[in-house]
């Protein structure tokens, strides 16, 4: 699966993000998540290139490499998220930002409530 991870990062991560969670593309397009998708559908998508996805012919990515990518996706799918709230496995920056936004929102709410109570 290490080879599959490298192949995924080189061929797929720019659209589906490094964790296979999908994401926004240009011109309002979207790359779907690969988590929870049947392996045969992932393989078919690689050879047909649906929507704005490129076609990965056998000359570009061999069938063995395609299967290695799928194996890596399935292994990543079953890994526990040790970082807390998943948030698309974007990482600690997003999780920290969410904490700050919620915390500041609560502080503003308390300040408004105290100001209203003082009147």
How does the language model describe each region?
Residues 58-117:
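C-terminal capping alpha-helices of c-type cytochrome domains
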């Amino acid at each position: 699966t290490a080879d599959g991870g490298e192949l995924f990062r080189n061929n797929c991560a720019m659209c589906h993000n490094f964790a296979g969670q999908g994401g926004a593309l240009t011109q309002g397009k979207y790359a779907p998540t690969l988590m929870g998708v049947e392996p045969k559908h992932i393989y078919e998508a690689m050879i047909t290139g649906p929507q704005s996805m490129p076609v990965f012919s056998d000359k570009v990515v061999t069938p063995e490499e395609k299967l290695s990518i799928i194996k890596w996706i399935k292994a990543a799918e079953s890994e526990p998220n040790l970082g807390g709230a998943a948030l698309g496995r974007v990482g600690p920056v997003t999780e920290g930002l969410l904490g700050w936004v919620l915390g500041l929102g609560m502080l503003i709410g308390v300040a408004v409530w105290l100001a209203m109570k003082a009147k």
